[in-house]
């Protein structure tokens, strides 16, 4: 057998198996291969198993006893924005509420202003810096949402820039249209006018230019209510978009129920999801994307991961990287939050940031596991075992990232 790249002397491979999201007890079913190798050819995994194997290769990497994991997938981010909001933290510490800050022109509106005013080059450079940080922490595929333009011209601009990122970064980019992220200030007196604008102007234009695979809506009190969210998502579905929902984050907005009724590929946040919402999501095969970075940053309760897993929902994890509620690109930190604060087991967490996260962006056939035929997205981790990586929190355990781009493979040494 002849390979392009051979990774050998791996102490152990940890990987879920398959192409479909895992739920319940299956989330813990991780294949472990000791004293292992991975062979790569034409950007795909040719073979993976126990050493030694009769394989020759043009290039070789000595893993030096490190563990190997599938490349991580971040299924929920807001990478495409400009500016930061650390000044709001200082106000919060002085006792200002989010509404107080919003009335002063802060909150999401300040990010919308900064994003609208930023040049294309400034937005691209900021996004590339964030993607570089994510890659260094083992993330090889990233979902990126629009949502800081909030008018047709700006939302289309952000999506076009996301598509430019695909050729500028080694990280794979999956764009999502989130024109319904917030009600723009100019439409606050009549939010339905903005809903009509999203439906009649934005969605057809996004589809015409093939700028995004998914349509997302922030279904929440103070953003888009159930009926508004339902209307936008129904129209998006008619146009052929796959659906995502920011659901039940701060209140029981019935976003979970809506995700199940409309067959959304994922429902994200879910801190306040109902049993009915869970059951409808389970029936629809919707992936629950949990975002503990938000709970940590806002000092709010975490989503009940154990409840969701035990009721049979496939759970994924993401950073929700954004400047207002989760300003971190570090998915490893999110994994530790899930381990420590959400009582998820190490094997469940690995599934949640690999296969299930891939399925939350419709990539389960291509990535998320170390198996023959899957894309060669692999991370070498300097840790004695899987639990140690989440137990020893706050540092980067990734030593090397192996990333397929087409038929080629890029090797990025982190340490």
UniProtKB/Swiss-Prot annotation:
<feature type="binding site">
    <location>
        <position position="322"/>
    </location>
    <ligand>
        <name>N-formimidoyl-L-glutamate</name>
    </ligand>
</feature>
<keyword id="KW-0963">Cytoplasm</keyword>
<feature type="binding site">
    <location>
        <position position="85"/>
    </location>
    <ligand>
        <name>4-imidazolone-5-propanoate</name>
    </ligand>
</feature>
<comment type="function">
    <text>Catalyzes the hydrolytic cleavage of the carbon-nitrogen bond in imidazolone-5-propanoate to yield N-formimidoyl-L-glutamate. It is the third step in the universal histidine degradation pathway.</text>
</comment>
<feature type="binding site">
    <location>
        <position position="148"/>
    </location>
    <ligand>
        <name>4-imidazolone-5-propanoate</name>
    </ligand>
</feature>
<keyword id="KW-0479">Metal-binding</keyword>
<dbReference type="InterPro" id="IPR011059">
    <property type="entry name" value="Metal-dep_hydrolase_composite"/>
</dbReference>
<protein>
    <recommendedName>
        <fullName>Imidazolonepropionase</fullName>
        <ecNumber>3.5.2.7</ecNumber>
    </recommendedName>
</protein>
<comment type="pathway">
    <text>Amino-acid degradation; L-histidine degradation into L-glutamate; N-formimidoyl-L-glutamate from L-histidine: step 3/3.</text>
</comment>
<dbReference type="GO" id="GO:0008270">
    <property type="term" value="F:zinc ion binding"/>
</dbReference>
<feature type="binding site">
    <location>
        <position position="78"/>
    </location>
    <ligand>
        <name>Fe(3+)</name>
    </ligand>
</feature>
<keyword id="KW-0408">Iron</keyword>
<dbReference type="GO" id="GO:0005737">
    <property type="term" value="C:cytoplasm"/>
</dbReference>
<feature type="binding site">
    <location>
        <position position="246"/>
    </location>
    <ligand>
        <name>Zn(2+)</name>
    </ligand>
</feature>
<keyword id="KW-0369">Histidine metabolism</keyword>
<feature type="binding site">
    <location>
        <position position="249"/>
    </location>
    <ligand>
        <name>4-imidazolone-5-propanoate</name>
    </ligand>
</feature>
<dbReference type="InterPro" id="IPR005920">
    <property type="entry name" value="HutI"/>
</dbReference>
<feature type="binding site">
    <location>
        <position position="320"/>
    </location>
    <ligand>
        <name>Zn(2+)</name>
    </ligand>
</feature>
<dbReference type="InterPro" id="IPR006680">
    <property type="entry name" value="Amidohydro-rel"/>
</dbReference>
<feature type="binding site">
    <location>
        <position position="246"/>
    </location>
    <ligand>
        <name>Fe(3+)</name>
    </ligand>
</feature>
<feature type="binding site">
    <location>
        <position position="76"/>
    </location>
    <ligand>
        <name>Fe(3+)</name>
    </ligand>
</feature>
<dbReference type="GO" id="GO:0019557">
    <property type="term" value="P:L-histidine catabolic process to glutamate and formate"/>
</dbReference>
<feature type="binding site">
    <location>
        <position position="324"/>
    </location>
    <ligand>
        <name>N-formimidoyl-L-glutamate</name>
    </ligand>
</feature>
<feature type="binding site">
    <location>
        <position position="320"/>
    </location>
    <ligand>
        <name>Fe(3+)</name>
    </ligand>
</feature>
<feature type="binding site">
    <location>
        <position position="181"/>
    </location>
    <ligand>
        <name>4-imidazolone-5-propanoate</name>
    </ligand>
</feature>
<feature type="binding site">
    <location>
        <position position="148"/>
    </location>
    <ligand>
        <name>N-formimidoyl-L-glutamate</name>
    </ligand>
</feature>
<dbReference type="InterPro" id="IPR032466">
    <property type="entry name" value="Metal_Hydrolase"/>
</dbReference>
<dbReference type="GO" id="GO:0050480">
    <property type="term" value="F:imidazolonepropionase activity"/>
</dbReference>
<comment type="similarity">
    <text>Belongs to the metallo-dependent hydrolases superfamily. HutI family.</text>
</comment>
<feature type="binding site">
    <location>
        <position position="325"/>
    </location>
    <ligand>
        <name>4-imidazolone-5-propanoate</name>
    </ligand>
</feature>
<feature type="binding site">
    <location>
        <position position="78"/>
    </location>
    <ligand>
        <name>Zn(2+)</name>
    </ligand>
</feature>
<dbReference type="Pfam" id="PF01979">
    <property type="entry name" value="Amidohydro_1"/>
</dbReference>
<feature type="binding site">
    <location>
        <position position="76"/>
    </location>
    <ligand>
        <name>Zn(2+)</name>
    </ligand>
</feature>
<keyword id="KW-0862">Zinc</keyword>
<dbReference type="GO" id="GO:0005506">
    <property type="term" value="F:iron ion binding"/>
</dbReference>
<keyword id="KW-0378">Hydrolase</keyword>
<dbReference type="GO" id="GO:0019556">
    <property type="term" value="P:L-histidine catabolic process to glutamate and formamide"/>
</dbReference>
